Swiss-Prot record:
CC cofactor: prenylated FMN; Mn(2+)
PANTHER family according to UniProt: 3-OCTAPRENYL-4-HYDROXYBENZOATE CARBOXY-LYASE-RELATED, FERULIC ACID DECARBOXYLASE 1
Main location: membrane
Lineage, broadest ranks: Bacteria, Pseudomonadati, Pseudomonadota, Gammaproteobacteria, Alteromonadales
Protein name stated in the entry: 3-octaprenyl-4-hydroxybenzoate carboxy-lyase
Amino-acid positions noted as binding Mn(2+) in the UniProt annotation, renumbered to this chain: N172, E238
Source organism per UniProt: Idiomarina loihiensis (strain ATCC BAA-735 / DSM 15497 / L2-TR)
Manner of cofactor binding, per the entry note: Binds 1 prenylated FMN per subunit.
Gene3D superfamilies xrefs: Single helix bin, UbiD C-terminal domain-like
Length: 490
């Protein structure tokens, strides 16, 4: 599905009745959050606020408010089609050698397409149609959303942060929230294991005391945004992956004040630097857990240049108790993760991140069990294979006769196939999201694995129960009689 930028995607949504323009004056202080939250919970459209109080710039919200819109942003017509995206990533992550000449010929188009999607650099970029620098930089002119009553300040939420570590060709793209600190200051909240933070750490080691170049794109196209939150193999840039999603090369342009390349068709670009040692207290903010997080210190991002398109659109969101946009993203990306996990663990049948589990904190896995202890191997694999699951606190493993997406099925398996002492695995002192205030130490906590599979010899000495199943003949006979019986007729 070809679209070049956010505006193309907005037009596509409007054609499909998936976008609502709001002309009434709406305050970015709390009101946009409340309207967006109600709309998302009703599985409503993306929202374009065209009359934002105190600003002449429209705000786009609830863009990824349904799994189908996430799929559309990734170039697919349905959520189930995202399995194909996952299969492509699994292939790129661990490509298998061709089994013969014919297989090699069949693989050629796939390799050719991947190699042809390197980003295209252009000079006269739409994102640099208007340029402000020095004293003209004033971030308060942006309609930055103040999401919750207890939030300390307005918060940039969909900023696509572009960094590059020393001696690295590939740039890193990441989504990190940024607290408004002043007219030209933001706080860059990135966790220590994220790509941007790692680039910064390496820079400080290689260039002590020198400013670290950073750029942030606001209002990038959906494929590029989603590429930044997808487990793209290290051999492939997020820009190239975005090109694969939308079936057209990502156009980029070099920043005015540094050598970073940003999406050429983004709505707004912030350019600047992080001064090593310049830190500020970030938070509290309402987060995806449904609670306000604790205050912590993060680097300060000083903005030296703001460039933007003519009549720019500001893209925003909020996070709160699920469901919110991160939870919806989790539901959609769940389908991308499954082929990646199956590549490493073919015995996995399904994998589910319930949205009420705050996107990633609880996972349910169903599998074709083959030997004693197999369930424990799979739960350990979930925690270790993809970095996206290093913060998953609970993993429940069931047999393939259980529907991972039906709590009635999962709870039945847990209560009939588990002994709490034997089948619960606790792992202490593991990485935990620092926003998880339930952990005893910030950033360090425990994990629980639950083996809700049928037990094999070696796992139990008792005779194991056999599930009750009606015979097919009787079921067929009753199917034929059912309408005639009129049991459900009032």
């Amino acid at each position: 599905m070809k679209y070049q930028d956010l505006r193309d995607f907005i037009a596509l949504l409007e054609e499909r009745g998936e976008l609502k323009r709001i002309q009434q004056e709406i305050d970015p202080y709390l009101e946009i959050t409340e309207i967006s939250d109600r709309t998302l919970k009703a599985q409503g459209p993306a929202l374009l606020f065209e009359n934002v109080k105190g600003h002449d710039m429209p705000v786009l919200a609830n863009l990824f408010g349904t799994p189908d819109r996430v799929a559309l942003g990734m170039g697919q017509e349905s959520v189930t089609a995202l399995r194909d995206v996952g299969k492509l990533l699994a292939f790129l992550k661990e490509p298998e050698p061709p089994k013969g000449f014919r297989d090699a010929l069949n693989l050629l188009p796939k390799y050719k397409k991947v190699l042809s999607m390197s980003p295209k650099s252009i000079k006269k970029a739409p994102c640099q149609q208007v340029v402000m620098s020095g004293d003209d930089v004033d971030l308060t002119k942006l309609p930055i959303q103040h999401c919750w009553p207890g939030d300390v300040a307005p918060l940039v939420t969909w900023g696509l942060t572009v960094t590059r570590g020393p001696h690295k060709e590939r740039q890193n793209l990441g989504i990190y929230r940024q607290q408004l600190l002043g007219p030209n200051k933001l706080i860059m909240r990135w966790l220590s294991h994220r790509g941007g933070a790692l680039d910064f750490q390496e820079w400080c080691q290689q260039h002590p005391g020198e400013r670290f170049p950073v750029s942030v794109a606001l209002g990038a196209d959906p494929a590029t945004i989603l590429g930044a939150v997808t487990p793209v193999p290290d051999s492939l840039s997020e820009y190239a992956f975005a090109g694969l999603l939308r079936d057209s090369k990502t156009e980029v342009t070099q920043c005015l004040s540094n050598d970073l390349q940003v999406p050429a068709h983004a709505e707004i670009i912030l350019e600047g630097y992080i001064e090593p040692g310049e830190m500020a207290a970030e938070g509290p903010y309402g987060d995806h857990t449904g609670y306000y997080n604790e205050v912590d210190e993060f680097p300060v991002f000083t903005v030296t240049h703001v460039t933007h398109r003519k009549d720019p659109i500001y893209h925003s969101t909020y996070t709160g108790r699920p469901p919110d946009e991160p939870a919806v993203l989790g539901v959609a990306l769940n389908e991308v993760f499954i082929p990646l996990l199956q590549k490493q663990f073919p015995e996995i049948v399904d994998f589910y991140l319930p949205p009420e589990g705050c996107s990633y904190r609880l996972a349910v896995v169903t599998m074709k069990k083959q030997y004693p202890g197999h369930a424990k191997r799979v739960m350990m694999g979930v925690w270790s294979f993809l970095r996206q699951f290093m913060y998953t606190k609970f993993v429940i493993v069931c047999d393939d006769d259980v529907n991972a997406r039906d709590w009635k099925d999962v709870i039945w398996a847990m209560t009939t196939r588990m002994d709490p002492a034997r089948d619960t695995t606790l792992v202490e002192n593991t990485p935990i999201d620092y926003l998880d205030f339930a952990s005893p130490v910030s950033g360090l906590g425990s994990k629980m694995g639950m083996d809700a599979t049928n037990k094999w010899p070696g796992e139990t000495d008792r005779e194991w129960g056999e599930p009750i199943v009606m015979s097919d003949e009787v079921k067929q006979r009753v199917d034929e009689l059912w309408d005639e019986l009129n049991i459900m007729e009032s």
